[in-house]
Amino acid sequence: MADSSCGKKSTKCPHCSSASQKNALCICSCKTKLSPMSVVEMSQTSSTGSSEFIVSPEKRKEKGASKDVTSGKDSPSKSSNIERKPSQQQWGRGNFTEGKVPHIRMDNGAALQEIYTFGRILGQGSFGMVIEAIDKERETKWAIKKVNKEKAGSSAVKLLEREVDILKSVKHEHIIHLEQVFETPKKMYLVMELCEDGELKEILERKGHFSENETRWIIQSLASAIAYLHNKDIVHRDLKLENIMVKSSFIDANNEMNLNIKVTDFGLAVKKHGRSEVMLQTTCGTPIYMAPEVINAHDYSQQCDIWSIGVIMYILLCGKAPFMASSEEKLFELIKKGELHFKNSIWNSISDCAKSVLKQLMKVDPAHRITAKELLDNQWLTGNTVSSARPTNVLEMMKEWKNNPESDEESTTDQRDSRSGQEESKVYQPSRNVPDVSNSSDEEEGKQVGRTNKTCRKNNCFISPNCEIPSQHLEHFCNSFFVVGL
């Protein structure tokens, strides 16, 4: 790798290909001054070698102006002063699967002033800040995250490096885009996509809460991003309103806000190695968004992100968190119980289907929690439902019937009205096998296929055979439900 110190090792001039003079100014015989930003390397999408660049200060100029070292006069620049050469050594930290992100190593950050015009501060932390910047050559706006590695400490720097590695490896319309990285011995600069509308949390605070349709669009985008990450075995682990940025927004004809969101801040994100069953153990995240299994310090998987999506959706709909308490200890107790309430009057205008989605997202047991992919296919999210959603599995139907038997009685009344008086009076007894509700011809047909197949008396459809789960409901493929004795 080329030495970044011009005084110690000669390099080739990008203009004339001759060796530069061995002096502090690093001036070539063709009178071109070389930049202190002498080595630029590209993080690769595979394990192949990287590319090194030697960059002159004229590589980027505002409106194409450059300065001659000897005359001091400005002269137009017509070409990019970059020389590429192969390298056997790769400076990147790992192999990536999505596009190339330049990772530029410098002696100091002064060279950035040649590339960007810095503007307002967008955010500030204990050891870094985010600044709006304009690329002088392309006249494009970016958000540059500047981190002081010395103040951050080794542990925080490791998290930052992991964040950079993950951002280099992803490409999705609803995940923040990393354009390039500049790094000095003391600082790191992440040039990222600028989201001019700010944090989703700020917009929520101004609105109070979002409508159901507005929330649906946000959750669609969020679910798409998380499904993409989970498919790549990446777990975000810190999903919250503050970590969802808004690139742009508009008000549609129905006076509803449409937001183009971007998931950001991958400081706690981790890429799992191995099969999807691999579990995580580190307790991390923001308390009100943390899943029960994370609080319990149990092994957990990417399903912790799904719980966080549920919390976000709940807050978007009503403006308040699902669980609130006077102390963190009490808050964690509420989260571990996972009892959702919809007592606020706002919930009167929210569909039962949306509430059902919330319940599926916030199952205390992660094994029963809906996945990101399943969420994308959910009828409420796709907009393919016009009525209240009903549970899709036997266990959920059992719970619904126990909590609200009146609703089930209403649904079965219509079914009984369509049957004969004799069929209305039938009482079905629970059994590990499907109750005998078919005639002899049905039984003979079942014997032919070697199992106890039955037929629905309502629509003559096939009934799922030999269910191993003791239940109060039987589900037919025609979506008819028959209540049996408890």
Swiss-Prot record:
GO terms for cellular component: nucleus; perinuclear region of cytoplasm. Its EC number is 2.7.11.1. It holds the Pfam family Pkinase. It is found in: Cytoplasm, Perinuclear region. Residues 41-53, 68-80, 428-440 have a biased composition (Polar residues). ATP binds at L122, G123, Q124, G125, S126, F127, G128, M129, V130, K145. Residues 39-100, 402-451 are annotated as: Disordered. InterPro entries: Kinase-like_dom_sf, Prot_kinase_dom, Protein_kinase_ATP_BS, Ser/Thr_kinase_AS. Autophosphorylated. One of its GO terms (biological process) is mitotic DNA damage checkpoint signaling. Gene3D superfamilies: Transferase(Phosphotransferase) domain 1 (1.10.510.10). Residues 116-381 form the Protein kinase domain. One of its GO terms (molecular function) is protein serine kinase activity. Transmembrane segments: none annotated. It catalyses: L-seryl-[protein] + ATP = O-phospho-L-seryl-[protein] + ADP + H(+); L-threonyl-[protein] + ATP = O-phospho-L-threonyl-[protein] + ADP + H(+). Residues 57-66, 413-426 have a biased composition (Basic and acidic residues). Keywords: ATP-binding, Cytoplasm, Kinase, Nucleotide-binding, Phosphoprotein, Serine/threonine-protein kinase, Transferase. The active site is at D238 (proton acceptor). Belongs to the protein kinase superfamily. CAMK Ser/Thr protein kinase family. CaMK subfamily. Interacts with vimentin/VIM. Serine/threonine protein kinase which phosphorylates vimentin/VIM. Therefore may play a specific role in the dynamic behavior of the intermediate filament cytoskeleton. PANTHER family: SERINE/THREONINE-PROTEIN KINASE. This is Serine/threonine-protein kinase 33. It comes from Bos taurus.
